[in-house]
Amino acid sequence: MILYHASTMYHLLCCIVHKLAYHPNDAAELLMLEYIKPDKSRKSFLKQVIDSGFFTTARYVPEQKFKLKKGNALDNTSSEKEIKSVIENISKTFENWLDEDITKFEEIYVASDQHSLGIYLTSKSIPYHYFEDASGMLSEQSRYLSITKSNNMTNHIINEYLGCMGRNSCVKSKLCDLRHQQKGFYDEKAEDFCIYDILKFKIPDKVPDIINFFGGISHKIRGDKKICLYLTQDLNTLKIKDLDLQELMMTTLVDYMCGDEYVLVVKPHPKDR
């Protein structure tokens, strides 16, 4: 049996594509962070995931409840004993919640290993495969670390101590889109995982099912103009909360990249409201 873990809709896409391409006939369980969807739509979305048949079973990881059992918050002055205590609290809480023998899974694929599953696996020296957090992010870990540090210092301290984000010896491989990494990037554990290529060359017959699952709608754009596809960003995650600033950033980018010779097509971010 295979275990997949997703913390964002992008990660869910990675898990679905990987499952269909490399483990089409294997039973698989999917764990999703509860934050992947707003509270009011979680129940219906979980049913949608299960009904899709991509995975044998699926459930949410209640990270919010786990936070209450971590213990004291950590900072740069925390001792190793204090750090280990918090890690042990998280691991025990996750293990009790999982209520399964983790060794039954032949392979484990984890996205965002700085959360409870990744902390549990790393602290117990259990091997797993790591999905990069976003396309091209494996080569920009310093930027990613700065974001997580500003979001939660306790998590940052644990990340550094355990070597989360794919930086520890438990990691068997790092699945990433090699063409989108920074120039000169090299990692001996990096394995090319390009969703576009896999969909086009390995599982083209599954593309309609995947598009339908994510609510994709085909649009025919008429005319001779070139197409500019704009993928919006969840700026709130980057601590850019001012709506006027968000609007300025978006309009400036569109004005710069999309001239009159283009038709602008906007693909909303999954967290856009």
Model-predicted regions and their roles:
Residues Y120-K124, V254-G259:
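Alpha-helix C-terminal capping segments
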Residues L145-T232:
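A nucleotide-sugar donor-handling region in carbohydrate enzymes
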Residues M257-R273:
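Catalytic donor nucleotide-activated moiety binding site of glycosyltransferases and closely related
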Residues L3-G166:
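Active-site and donor-binding regions of nucleotide-sugar-utilizing enzymes
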Residues E34, A134, D234-N236, P270:
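Residue-level signal for short, function-critical loop segments
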Residues I87-S91, V207-I210, L243-E247:
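A conditional alpha-helix N-cap/helix-loop micro-motif detector
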Residues M1-H23, A27-L30, K40, G216-I221, ...:
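N-terminal beta-strand-loop-alpha-helix module at the start
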